[in-house]
């Protein structure tokens, strides 16, 4: 049926192949920013992280790890919100791709709260309980199920208060919508290919819940957000 979730068929995205001209990559990253701004990506992240910030002691720095940061657009909107709330914050933004980090460096010049670190999401150079919150946006769908479970397990280990996974929801309707939208609003080859592929690479809410359980995450919620977003949030019971 059209309204049922299609089977997951993990395919590579062109951005992951890292062989496109970087001006084309930059243009595609700007498309991602627009998608996050107008299709709820930032809204979902800020909704959840605001709840963590409100419960954080005002006299202590709020320490965040952003996994697979890309252009660092997610840390930027988080820092903007923290500034509005007069909360002292530090965001460590991790990515394995040096080209991405060079691009992110240009974007965060006005954000001394953000610190870029090159490293592998599968083995980040951080110990247990190193951060108040770990966040990961539009990245989990790039990985196999086993890899995704390991990332959730690591996020749970590294965070003191919890973690936020903000990603796409696999569905035929979402695929059709983004396929049409990208043909209407962008000429970028990478965006036109990767956006529909991302939707079909994504997990469903039930799969997210199953993976969290497999990762040993004890206290979590999985919520759907319009349009076709999933928020997987872990909160420590003692937080």
Regions found by a protein language model. Name each.
Residues 135:
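A conserved beta-strand element that flanks and buttresses the S-adenosyl-L-methionine
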Residues 1-18:
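N-terminal auxiliary segments of SAM/dcSAM-dependent transferases
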Residues 65, 71-123:
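Class I SAM-dependent methyltransferase SAM/SAH-binding core
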Residues 221-239:
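Core SAM-dependent methyltransferase catalytic element
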Residues 168-215, 221:
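C-terminal alpha-helical "lid/dimerization" subdomain adjacent to the S-adenosyl-L-methionine
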Residues 143-154:
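A short, conserved alpha-helix within the catalytic core of class I
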Residues 18, 22-53:
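Class I SAM-dependent methyltransferase Rossmann-like catalytic core
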Residues 159-168:
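Conserved beta-strand signature within the Rossmann-like core of class I S-adenosyl-L-methionine
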């Amino acid at each position: 049926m059209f309204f049922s979730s299609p089977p997951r068929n993990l395919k590579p995205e062109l951005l992951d192949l890292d062989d496109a001209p970087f001006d084309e990559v930059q243009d595609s990253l700007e498309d991602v920013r627009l998608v996050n701004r107008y299709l709820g990506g930032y809204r979902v992240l800020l909704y959840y992280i605001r709840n963590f910030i409100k419960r954080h002691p005002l006299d202590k720095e709020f320490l965040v790890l952003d996994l697979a940061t890309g252009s660092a657009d997610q840390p930027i909107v988080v820092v903007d919100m923290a500034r509005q709330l007069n909360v002292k914050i530090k965001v460590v933004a991790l990515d394995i791709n040096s080209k991405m980090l060079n691009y992110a460096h240009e974007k965060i010049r006005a954000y001394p709260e953000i610190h870029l670190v090159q490293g592998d999401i599968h083995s980040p150079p951080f110990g247990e309980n190193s951060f108040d919150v770990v966040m990961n946006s539009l990245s989990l769908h790039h990985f196999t199920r086993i890899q995704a479970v390991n990332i959730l397990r690591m996020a749970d280990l590294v965070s003191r208060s919890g973690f936020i996974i903000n990603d796409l929801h696999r569905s035929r309707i979402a695929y059709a919508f983004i396929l049409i939208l990208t043909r209407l609003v962008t000429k970028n080859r990478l965006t036109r290919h990767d956006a529909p592929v991302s939707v079909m690479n994504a997990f469903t809410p039930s799969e997210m819940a199953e993976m969290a359980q497999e990762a040993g995450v004890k206290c979590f919620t999985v919520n759907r957000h319009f349009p076709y977003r999933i928020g997987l949030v872990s909160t420590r019971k003692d937080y």
